[in-house]
Structure formats: structure tokens, C-alpha cells
Amino acid sequence: MKVAVLGAAGGIGQALALLLKTQLPAGSDLSLYDIAPVTPGVAVDLSHIPTDVTIAGFAGMDPTDALVGADVVLISAGVARKPGMDRSDLFNINAGIIKNLAGKCAEVCPNACIGIITNPVNTTVPIAAEVLKQAGVYDKRKLFGITTLDVIRSETFVSELKGISLADVEVPVIGGHSGVTILPLLSQVKGVEFTAEEIATLTPRIQNAGTEVVEAKAGGGSATLSMGQAAARFGLSLVRALQGEEGIVECTYVDGGSEHATFFAQPVLLGKNGVEEVLAYGELSEFETNARDAMLEELKANITLGEEFVAG
């Protein structure tokens, strides 16, 4: 099993690479790519960690060598948020980066599962889909927007609020991956009751948690370490499913035949070909139903923006 990380010299990429080096199954290959010249050095640094994961690093304008034979490609390349920016402000730079890298994946590893971390995910995933379609290699079972950070934040905040073990907390998060399109289904958390006031406070905190980190870092970065952990959780789940482990479910942003939008985040059963089945997200509370319906216009506009970017 070969996993490639594109954007591996950045804050997310290095954290993700560290976690993959220590947690991928023995015998895995880990390939790091970034335009930054430091990337081969990041691989050398990680190679000193004693795990049975082979690692190589590649720098420069062409990711081909990193992508050859890849089963999973995780893309975190792009610019990060700074104070005052929202994820959509990243679009102009990151859209072009994703278009180019998706094109390389189509050319070099057309059968790989691709997980997109680069924001704005609501838009970068449709960009990748359109590029793969143009190349004639699009398989909607194998393209994912990694929204796991919204899930781990939800689980952490619920655990803190209610004083319960994280081992007992599961929070499905549906919709998209920015602002109001992030919808944690707090009504579905087992064994916990929330007041209307708690839901009205906790939901926007989860939606705006990225801004919380950007402001706390005072211009020094965005959510890199927690995003690295979230991407590793998703990537490792995907690897386990590809290797035949059954019953692995993660919330992720996919082209899954949703009645709401072409791309929609919801629980997905992972399997040997990527998406095994898009699962129903269950009954919503009145608050959640209203929030879902209110977000759809923005989510659809984000998707259209990506499709039109590729169409030119």
C-alpha cells in the first residue's frame, strides 16, 4: 500500500506525514511531495523513526515520482488562512494548485483514492472531480473531501461540555466544510441531552473553530496540527478499508447521490474500492433541519464555483 502526501512540507503535511510514518501498517510506502526544497529532508528526518514504513521525499514542480504506484493520495498543498480571511478567500490560489495536482493524479495514478484537505474543500473537491472527468478517469467512489476535522472538533467540544469520555462520543457532521455548511448532528449523540441554549452555542463554535485557531495563533498559522490528526484518521481508515477491513465508517464530502447537492458530507461506509456505500444520516431535529435547508444555497454555489473554474 502506497500513500502519497502532496503538500508535505507545510504545517498540515508535516504533521500528517509524521502520523502516517508512525501509524501506517507495516510494509507500507509513504511518499512526500512539495514544491519546497526542504521536502526530501523532511523524509530523511522521518526515516529515522523506527517503523516498518518506507519513506521517500520529492521536491520541485513535478510530483510524478511521488505519485507513481500510489493507492492513496492526500492533498494538503496550498496557502493557509490568515486572520481576516475565510476559506473562500483561499480560492484564487488554491483552486489552481488543486487543478494541476488532480491533473497529475489523473495522468500518473488514475486508480488512486484521492483525499482533498486543501481549502475551500466545498469547492476544491468539485474542481478535482471536473479535472478527472475531463481526463476520463473519474470514479466518484475514489474522491473524498476530508471533513474529519469537523468531526474531531465536535467530539472534543461535546466531551468537554458534558464531562464524558471521548471513547463514548460520536458526532456525525454533514453538509460541507466551511462556516454554516458544517452541521454537527448533536441530536444523534448517544446518551447525551443538550439544551436548546447549548446547541445554539456549540453549533457555531464548531462551525467557527478554524477561526478560533487562526486568531489564537495571531497571524502565525492556521489549524495545522489538529488538521494533520484529522487527515491521518481519515487516511488510515481508508487504508484499512482498502486492505479489506470491514465496517469502517467516516463522515466525508463525496459525490454520493445526495438529494441536497452534488457533493455532500455524510457518513460513508469505506471498502476495497473507496466508497462502499453512502449511508443515510438519520433523523434530524427541527434545529438541524432548518440549518441544513439554510446552508444549501451556499453549498451549491461553492460547488458551482469549482465546476465553472475548470470549465473556464
UniProtKB/Swiss-Prot annotation:
Substrate binds at R81, R87, N119, R153. The active site is at H177 (proton acceptor). GO terms for biological process: malate metabolic process; tricarboxylic acid cycle. CDD domains: MDH_glyoxysomal_mitochondrial. PROSITE patterns: MDH. The keyword Plastid does not apply. The keyword Oxidoreductase applies. It is an enzyme of class 1 (oxidoreductase). Keywords: NAD, Oxidoreductase, Tricarboxylic acid cycle. One of its GO terms (molecular function) is L-malate dehydrogenase (NAD+) activity. GO terms for cellular component: cytoplasm. Pfam families: Ldh_1_C, Ldh_1_N. It catalyses: (S)-malate + NAD(+) = oxaloacetate + NADH + H(+). NAD(+) binds at G7, A8, A9, G10, G11, I12, G13, D34, N94, I117, T118, N119, M227. Its EC number is 1.1.1.37. It comes from the Bacteria. NCBIfam families: MDH_euk_gproteo. Homodimer. Catalyzes the reversible oxidation of malate to oxaloacetate. PANTHER family: MALATE AND LACTATE DEHYDROGENASE, MALATE DEHYDROGENASE, MITOCHONDRIAL. Belongs to the LDH/MDH superfamily. MDH type 1 family. This is Malate dehydrogenase.
